[in-house]
Amino acid sequence: MDSVAFEDVAINFTCEEWALLGPSQKSLYRDVMQETIRNLDCIGMIWQNHDIEEDQYKDLRRNLRCHMVERACEIKDNSQCGGPFTQTQDSIVNEKIPGVDPWESSECTDVLMGRSSLNCYVRVDSEHKPCEYQEYGEKPYTHTQCGTAFSYQPCFQIHERPQHGKKLYDCKECASFSSLENLQRHMAAHHGDGPRICKLCGNAFIWPSLFHMLRRTHTEEKPYEYEQCSTAFPAYSSTLRHERTHSGEKPYQCKQCGKAFSCSCYTQLYERTHTGEQSYECKQCGKAFYHLGSFQRHMIVHTGDGPHKCKICGKGFLSPSSVRRHKRTHTGEKPYECKYCGKAFSDCTGFRRHMITHTGDGPHKCKVCGKAFDSPSLCRRHETTHTGEKPYKCECGKAFSDFYYFRNHETTHTGEKPYKCKQCGKAFICCTYLQIHERIHTGERPYKCKQCGKAFRSSNYIRVHEKTHTGEKPYECKQCGKALSHLKSFQRHMIMHTGDGPHKCKICGKSFDSPSSFRRHERIHTGERPYKCKLCGKGFRSSSYIQLHERTHTGEKPYGCQQCGKALSDLSSFRRHMITHTGNGPHKCKICGKGFDYPSSVQRHERTHTGEKPYECKECGKAFSHSSYLRIHERVHTGEKPYKCKECGKPFHCPSAFHKHERTHSMEKPYKCKECGEAFHCISSFHKHEMTH
C-alpha cells in the first residue's frame, strides 16, 4: 500500500484564497482540518516513520488557527508582536482543539492561546518540548535595524525576514501571494486542472479530503458513530459536539446572563438576542435574521431553489433532513410515537414538546405554575398569561403578548403581504399561510385522519377535526362556562364578551377577530352578495352559505343521525337535531330548561315564551320571531319561489313546503309513531296522529 503524503492530509489556504471560498466550503474546511489535527496529534510521537517534517505540522496548526475565527477584534496593549491582533472573517470556532486558538498577530502571523494570553503568558511550543511560559512584558528578542522587541522567538524570526509583509508573487488573473507555494496552490485551484468539482452542487476543491467531506453531505454517509446511542455523523467534530448532549457539558457561557451552551456558535447566536443584532436581511421582503441558517431557509421560500429536492412535488430544501421531514407530509408517516397516549408525530420537535405534557420535565419552567417548556421563548410567552404583560405595542395602541401576533397585526395597517402565490397572485403575511394556500391549487392534502380517513391541507385543520371524534374541548370560557374544541373558536367567542376584536365595524361597532369575518359582516350593511348560485342565480354573502345552498339543488345530505337515520345537509342543523335526542345543549332556556347549541338558538326559543316578534314586514306589517321566517314571508309579496321540484317542476317559496312535496314523489315517511309504528310524510301530520294516542 502506498504511503500517504503529508499534502494529502494537510490543507493550507492563504488569506487571499480564504477570501475566495464560499461559506459552505469554509465550514467543511474547518471540520476536515480539526479532524486532521486530532489524527496527527495521535501519531505525534512517531513522526520519523511518516516522513512528515515538524515544521509542516506547525504550519498546518498555524493555518487552521488563522481561519478559525470571525470578525475584527481590537485589543488594547497589543504591542507584544508589534502589531494589532485580528480575527479572520467568515468562520466560527465550534470547539477548542489542543494547541489551536484564535488570537493571531497580523505582523508575525503566529497565533496566541487567547485574549488572556496577551495579558498574562505566551505559549512556546518548540521541537515537541513541554510548554514553557514567559512572563508578559519581558521582550528579549530585539530587531537591530528597527528596534522592535519581541517576547516570542518565532515572531522575531518572521519579523527578520526581508520579504515579511510583502506579496512578491502575482497571479495575473486576480491576486498577489506572499510565497511561491501559495501562488502555485491558488493557480491549481482557480486557473488550472487541479480542483475537484462536485457534480451535485458545483463546489470546487483542491484537497481530496475536503472534497470527500462535501460528498458525504450529499450521500448522507456518516462514518463516525457515537457508541452510547449509535447516532452517526459525517464529521468527527460533530460526534464530539453530540457527546456533550449526553454528558451535559456546556462550556460556553453568555457574558450577559450566564446561560451555558454546548457549542460556541450557539452562544454567539444567543448573544444576539440581547444585542438585537440581525446580520442577515432579505432584500426581497426586508425580513432580518440572527443567523445564516435561518436566512438560507427563508430565501428558499422566495426562490424554491434548495439543493435537495422532494421527488414527489419537486420542492427544494436546504438539507437532506428537511426533505425527509417534508416527505412525511406526503406519506403521512409519523415515526415518533408517544408511549403514554399513543399519539404520533412526524417530527422530533413536536414529539419532544408533547412529551413534556406527560413528564412535566422540560428544561424551562414557569415560575408561577411550574409548567415546563422545551424552549425559553415558549416559557416566556406562557408566563405572560399569568402576568398579563403585553410588551409589543402597536402605534394604534393595541398591545400583544407575543411578537408573532404583533407582527401579523401590523400588516392590517401596512397591508404588507410579502408572500405571493405564483398561480393566482394571492398574497399572504407569512410563508406558512402561502404553503397551505398552494395546496388548494395542487390538491395536496397531506394530513389524514386515522379514524375516518378524511384528508386536510393543514395540520391545524386535522387537529380540529380529530377533536370531533374524541369530543375534546380544552378551551373553556371563564365567563359563561362554554367549552370549545379549538383556539380560533374560543377567540371568536371571547369577542362576544369583551367586544375587543381587532376589526371593528364602523356602522354598528361590532368587533371581529379576522379580516374575513369582518368583510362578511360588512356585506350585511351593504347588501353585497358576491357568491352566485350557478343553478338558480341566487346570491350569498359567504362562500360557505353558497355551498350549503347548492345542496338544496343536489339533495346532498352528508350528516346522518345514527339514532333515527335522519340525514341533514349542514353541520349546524345536524347538531340542533342531535339535541332533540340528547336534550343536552350547552345553552339552557331559563323558563323551561330546554338545551340548545347556540346562544342565538336560546334567544329564538325564548321568544316562544315571551311572544316577542322583533322582525316586521315592511309591506303588510306582519311580525315574526325570527329573521328567516320574515324572509320566507316576504316571498309571498315578491312572488319569488326559489325551490323547484325536479320531478314535476312545481315551485315553492320555502324549503319546508318543498321538502314535504318531494316526499309525495319519493314516498319517504321519516316520522314514525313509537306507539303503533305508523309513518308520516310531514311532522304536522305526525303530531296530529300522536294526539290520538
Swiss-Prot record:
Localization: Nucleus
Any single biological process term in GO: regulation of transcription by RNA polymerase II
Family matches, as PROSITE patterns: KRAB, ZINC_FINGER_C2H2_1, ZINC_FINGER_C2H2_2
Xref: Gene3D superfamilies: 6.10.140.140, Classic Zinc Finger
Molecular-function GO term, any one: DNA-binding transcription factor activity, RNA polymerase II-specific
ZnF C2H2-type: positions: 169-190, 196-218, 224-246, 252-274, 280-302, 308-330, 336-358, 364-386, 392-413, 419-441, 447-469, 475-497, 503-525, 531-553, 559-581, 587-609, 615-637, 643-665, 671-693
GO CC annotation terms, alphabetical: nucleus
The keyword Cell membrane belongs to this UniProt entry's keyword annotation: no
Similarity remark: Belongs to the krueppel C2H2-type zinc-finger protein family.
Function: May be involved in transcriptional regulation.
PANTHER family to which the protein is assigned, alphabetical: ZINC FINGER PROTEIN, ZINC FINGER PROTEIN 491
Protein name: Zinc finger protein 441
